């Protein structure tokens, strides 16, 4: 084997290894699913950006307490020269530069109110981030447990299909021995075709659930996922709290009321005087004045004088609103109506949140009872199927009875899968409803 062949084989081996590595499934626990969903969620990133913006708004509002420092410079070249009472004012290359400091002294409380509003906005953004985080976790949990449930249904139908394959082989042998009829074999084949149809539908559903989970955790859509938290543990729910004080929605409504009160103060500030202080210094130069002057004895001689100098300025301004056709009072009344609406929203949604948490508690309790009922039904279906298999093998039960027992087992297994999955989803919904997620 020459060197070229060795290089080609090495390249093929490396490509094979990379292909195997790319096909490795993603093993995912519920905790890992949550972490990846939080890290990938665009909505959560947008809420986090909104919080950063609110923090900057608060920092911006702080600067309103501080003096503003500005600098300016102006240059001018004016033609022709200006005539001023027989003299010429020349401004060719005239310049002026200055600095100015402005400090608000009293603004009717607008600056303080604006700072409080900015702080409320920051707190609102924090609660909005919490609410978005909860929504992401609820979506991740639902997708995770649904994916597990559909996978279990696939395995259940595959087991059911294997049972029908075994029964089909047994019936073929019985038909050859004259102990079964063609109708028995046709009924089994029909049932097996129906199971194949159901299995295909569930497999398609499982693939869609996998792609949905890939979207949530930020994985490629062709990534195979192996869920590791497949053991369902359901303990009897006791001591479930109906407290809603930790709900971010409730906090958002409270912040809305607080903001409404500040808006009233802001509207009232328009009726109050404002006081400001301004201090500055300016320097100008290259300003020339030309004219004629009496040199004595009636002799007029030309003269010119250039000016360059600096000057300071201190100014205190007071603005008092006197008459604006009731504009400010109407703004105050409007802000009061908005505050009233915010208080009504709080009353309404507090009742709705209480109903929601009560429903969540009821769902958890009912979900646990459904699991117990489904487990009992599955035990009975298992025993019934075992008995019917033995009786059918001993020719003491008809094929119809055996097929019915298998259908009952399938339904009981499906009921248990759905009950366990729904219970896990109800647990997450309860945590969200109480603000503990």
Where are these regions (language model features)?
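Bacterial Sec-pathway N-terminal export signals of envelope proteins
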Residues: 22-68, 74, 221, 227-263, ...
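Sec/SRP-type N-terminal targeting helices
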Residues: 45-49, 62-63, 105-133, 183, ...
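Periplasmic alpha-helical coiled-coil/stalk elements that build and connect Gram-negative outer-membrane
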Residues: 28, 135-248, 363, 367, ...
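Membrane-spanning beta-strand positions in outer-membrane beta-barrel proteins
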Residues: 43, 68-70, 110, 201, ...
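Small/polar, glycine/serine/threonine/aspartate-rich low-complexity segments that form flexible
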Residues: 23-25, 72-103, 230-234, 278-320
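Short segments within alpha-helical structural elements
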Residues: 194-219, 378-436
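Bacterial Sec-dependent N-terminal signal peptides
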Residues: 1-31, 38-41, 423, 437
């Amino acid at each position: 084997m020459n060197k070229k062949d060795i290089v080609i084989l090495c390249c093929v081996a490396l490509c094979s290894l990379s292909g195997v590595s790319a096909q490795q499934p993603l093993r995912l626990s519920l905790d890992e699913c949550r972490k990846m969903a939080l890290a990938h969620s665009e909505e959560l990133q947008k809420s986090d950006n909104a919080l950063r913006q609110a923090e900057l708004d608060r920092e911006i509002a702080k600067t309103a307490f501080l003096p503003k420092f500005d600098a300016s410079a102006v240059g001018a070249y004016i033609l022709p020269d200006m005539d001023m009472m027989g003299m010429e004012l020349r401004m060719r290359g005239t310049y002026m530069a200055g600095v100015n400091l402005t400090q608000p002294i009293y603004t009717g409380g607008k600056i303080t109110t604006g700072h409080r509003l900015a702080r409320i906005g920051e707190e609102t953004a924090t609660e909005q981030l919490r609410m978005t985080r909860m929504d992401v976790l609820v979506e991740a949990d639902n997708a995770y447990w649904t994916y597990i449930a559909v996978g279990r249904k696939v395995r259940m139908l595959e087991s059911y299909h294997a049972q029908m394959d075994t029964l089909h082989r047994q019936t073929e042998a019985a038909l050859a021995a004259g102990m079964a009829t063609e109708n028995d074999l046709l009924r089994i084949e029909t049932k097996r075709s129906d199971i194949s149809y159901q299995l295909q539908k569930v497999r398609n559903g499982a693939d869609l659930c996998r792609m949905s989970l890939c979207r949530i955790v930020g994985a490629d859509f062709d990534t195979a996922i192996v869920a590791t938290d497949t053991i369902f543990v359901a303990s009897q729910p006791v001591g479930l709290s109906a407290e809603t004080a930790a709900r971010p929605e409730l906090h958002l409504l409270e912040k809305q009321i607080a903001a409404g009160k500040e808006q009233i103060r802001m509207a009232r500030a328009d009726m109050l005087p404002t006081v400001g202080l301004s201090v500055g210094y300016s320097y100008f130069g290259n300003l020339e004045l030309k004219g004629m002057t009496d040199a004595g004895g009636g002799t007029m001689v030309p003269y010119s004088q250039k000016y360059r100098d600096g000057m300071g300025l201190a100014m205190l301004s007071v603005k008092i609103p006197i008459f604006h056709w009731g504009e400010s009072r109407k703004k105050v009344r409007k802000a009061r109506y908005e505050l009233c609406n915010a208080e009504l929203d709080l009353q309404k949604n507090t009742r709705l949140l209480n109903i929601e948490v009560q429903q969540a508690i009821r769902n958890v309790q009912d979900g646990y009872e459904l699991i117990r009922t489904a487990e009992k039904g599955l035990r009975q279906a298992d025993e019934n199927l075992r008995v019917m298999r033995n009786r059918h093998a001993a020719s003491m039960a008809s094929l119809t009875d055996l097929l019915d027992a298998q259908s009952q087992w399938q339904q009981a297994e499906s009921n248990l899968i759905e009950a366990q999955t729904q219970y896990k989803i109800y647990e997450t919904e309860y945590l969200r409803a109480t603000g503990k997620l």
